[in-house]
Amino acid sequence: MHNVNTTTTGLSLAKILASTELGDNTIQAGNDAANKLFSLTIADLTANKNINTTNAHSTSNILIPELKAPKSLNASSQLTLLIGNLIQILGEKSLTALTNKITAWKSQQQARQQKNLEFSDKINTLLSETEGLTRDYEKQINKLKNADSKIKDLENKINQIQTRLSELDPDSPEKKKLSREEIQLTIKKDAAVKDRTLIEQKTLSIHSKLTDKSMQLEKEIDSFSAFSNTASAEQLSTQQKSLTGLASVTQLMATFIQLVGKNNEESLKNDLALFQSLQESRKTEMERKSDEYAAEVRKAEELNRVMGCVGKILGALLTIVSVVAAAFSGGASLALADVGLALMVTDAIVQAATGNSFMEQALNPIMKAVIEPLIKLLSDAFTKMLEGLGVDSKKAKMIGSILGAIAGALVLVAAVVLVATVGKQAAAKLAENIGKIIGKTLTDLIPKFLKNFSSQLDDLITNAVARLNKFLGAAGDEVISKQIISTHLNQAVLLGESVNSATQAGGSVASAVFQNSASTNLADLTLSKYQVEQLSKYISEAIEKFGQLQEVIADLLASMSNSQANRTDVAKAILQQTTA
């Protein structure tokens, strides 16, 4: 059983009830004390009831309960009644305080309204007076204008009469008449001047009154504005002070939502601007790499096409030489390919054993004095001709070198025939003169040769074979000479095939270089494409993050709205209980 200290509690309650001025803090403290006492009393009553119930059950078989008259309230019951009365009194005090606050607020509003009405009446009165004075002032201004006009007309008439009088004879009757008119007009002018003076004085008086009223009106308007601003500031301050804890939390939540939304939007804008800048830079880089890749692929294709043409030209020339060799050998050169290969092997063995190549010694004078300068001369001529046709300088130089080498190969074939026919010494003696003659002749004939080569190729081969057969028939034994020429021509074919293979290999290497550069650019382009895809992914993530933050903001708004709705419901319930 709880022991309630009613003495201490009673003293506190007595002090509270004896107080004539109960503020909000006092009422709250009283409510807390009353609730505590009520809880303790209920617990005490519950304990007593449990004890009585236990005793009744234990003696149910022995004692029969008897009816007794109701007892008066014991100490606990009296305390409960006291607490109930206290709660009622505190509630009434709270309602009284609220009513007093509302009454004070209404009185304040009525005072402000009365003050506003006073300002309004004063302003309206001053405004009406100002408008009346303004109308009077306008009338006086018009009168002044009319008076000035009248005086001016009289002065003009007097001036005209005076001018006329100066022209007339002094004894003339008309002059006497005009003199009388002048006197009358002068009298009227003096009267008009006096009237204007009176009008001007009245106008100045009205002007002074109008100025005073205008200043009073402006002063009242300024006072009213200051009063309205002060009242608004006081009302706003009162509203801010009246905010409860829940309203303050709601206000803080709204401020937080505003800051989060603004920060989220600015962050998204910054991210999008950064990603867009990066995308633009990567786009420019990809376009540059794409152009470089296309250029390298184009170079490789052009080189493959050129080297294919060179291979076809060399193949055709080697076919021509093979046909010439077949003409000398009666077709036997086709079966003697192994013999040509054996000669090359023999030349390699002799060179390894003695250090000298008999084929190199035989062709050395012609190569140094004729072939090498001739190739250079022809290459330069082909290059200049191609540049004149509008071909790029670098490409023209490369193609000119190839065509010069081909022409040199043709001369080399002729040199092989020459060595086989007239011998090493004669070839050495004739090399220099032949080189000059052939160089000059071929330089002059290059354009015509390129233009007419395809149409005159058959005739050229036929005439060359006929002349060479005739020359060889006059020089020695026909069969032996033809076999020797055929052998050397076959060697020339093998050499030409080697040159062709080397040329094709060089072209393949150059093409591979271009293709390697193209592959590098393609790899960079692929990397840039991947980076752009990553940037797009980052943009999507930024937008998704923005959406998530917006969802958080929406949840906060919903929580704030629910809190405000609960607060409104509580306020409605309190208002209903108050009005009831």
UniProtKB/Swiss-Prot annotation:
Protein name: Type 3 secretion system translocon protein SctE
Family designation: Belongs to the SctE/SipB/YopB family.
Major place of residence: secreted
Membrane-related topology note: Multi-pass membrane protein
Species: Shigella dysenteriae
The keyword Cytoplasm appears for this protein: no
Function of the molecule: Component of the type III secretion system (T3SS), also called injectisome, which is used to inject bacterial effector proteins into eukaryotic host cells. IpaB/SctE and IpaC/SctB are inserted into the host membrane where they form a pore and allow the translocation of effector proteins into the cytosol of target cells.
Spans traversing the lipid bilayer: 313-333, 399-419
Gene that this sequence comes from: sctE
Localization of this protein: Secreted; Host membrane
GO cellular component: extracellular region; host cell membrane; membrane
Alphabetical keyword list: Host membrane, Membrane, Plasmid, Secreted, Transmembrane, Transmembrane helix, Virulence
Subunit: The core secretion machinery of the T3SS is composed of approximately 20 different proteins, including cytoplasmic components, a base, an export apparatus and a needle. This subunit is involved in the formation of a pore, called the translocon, in host membrane.
InterPro entries: BipB-like_C (IPR006972), IpaB/BipB/SctE_N (IPR032391), T3SS_SctE/BipB (IPR003895)
